[in-house]
Amino acid sequence: MMNRYYLLSVIVAFNLFSIAHTQSQTRESMSRELEEVARVATVMVDGDVCQRIMTERALKKLFVIDPRDQWAGSDNFDVNPEPFIQTKKTLMRLAKLRPYPIDCNLWMLFKENPGKIQILIRNQYEMSQFWTWGVLYQEIPPEMAEVLSSGKPKTISGKGDLISVLTPVYNSLGDIVGLVEVVGRLRVNWQENVK
């Protein structure tokens, strides 16, 4: 009984610390901390593995619109489990580098459709300044295009109290094949999605 009480006390204390730490963050300090996570993400996320996440079948059907079923593309979405799980775990570990809630999302380019980008892996809090719920792929936003062309990370403080750092993902040939969006929120609203 005492062990349960002790464990519960530790969990509550950690959560209160996380909330207090997040609430006391300034935009500048959070930006610096997210930039550090983004720097590590560029080194740790393997672009070759990321390029193997989507199955060939899913990639072929993604841009084909069936006149009888406009949502068939999402029905055909499929991933190769090994590279997906490996990358998802890496992104989840990166998000634990901060003591407050952040997400590390993987955005991937398409070889066949160079003007489009896809959020391939989202994480626990589903935070993003760029993703619209339900969208399989989208035009590349200007901020992402800048990172893709320069190869340099970019910090964006746009939507409300969200701060994102976009950082490139490289394959073994040195080509940029995608981005990681490291995103946090200055003020966490734990009731935001509760209706």
Language model regions located:
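Extreme N-terminal signal-anchor transmembrane helix of membrane signaling/transducer proteins, especially
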Residues: 3-24
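Juxtamembrane extracytoplasmic/periplasmic/luminal helical "stalk" adjacent to the first N-terminal
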Residues: 18-72
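Short amphipathic alpha-helical segments
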Residues: 31, 84-92
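Short N-terminal helix-loop-first-beta-strand/juxtamembrane motif that initiates sensory/input modules
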Residues: 40, 44-47, 94-115
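Extracytoplasmic/periplasmic sensor domains and loops in membrane signaling proteins
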Residues: 82, 88, 120-159
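A short beta-strand signature within small-molecule sensing/ligand-binding domains used
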Residues: 160-168
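Short hydrophobic/glycine-rich mini-motifs in sensory/regulatory modules
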Residues: 170-180
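Helix-start (N-cap) segments at beta->loop->alpha junctions
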Residues: 182-194
